Amino acid sequence: MKGKIKSVVFKDAKRWRRWLRVNHRRKTEIWLVLPKKSAGGDSYRVYYNQALEEALCFGWIDSRIKPLDETRSLVRFTPRKSKNWSRYNIERALELMRKRKMTEAGRKVLPPDLISRLEKLGKTGDHAE
């Protein structure tokens, strides 16, 4: 990667979700500043798991992590494709659907075989946008 990375810090997960709601179709990437697991304190209130869950809701995924300093990392999020879903992220997506947090944009990139199974079970109804 050449040049300086433009990064963003969100005060909380609600603000990250708001950014995704507005930008998930317009932007091609964002680099979030997130605390490392070993970092103490609460100066950064969006943590990796929260950031990933909100991203999945809008059809985005994390792709690269770069150290920023001793306590923070840069994490790149981009729109995701339908293939190459890990079992962990499929389970996470199902849980987000149960919680009614998954948006139409998030459902559109679910693996086709998973969508077929969910339709048979009647579990792909409209959820929060």
What is the role of each PLM region?
Residues 1-129:
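Charge-dense, helix-prone N-terminal extensions
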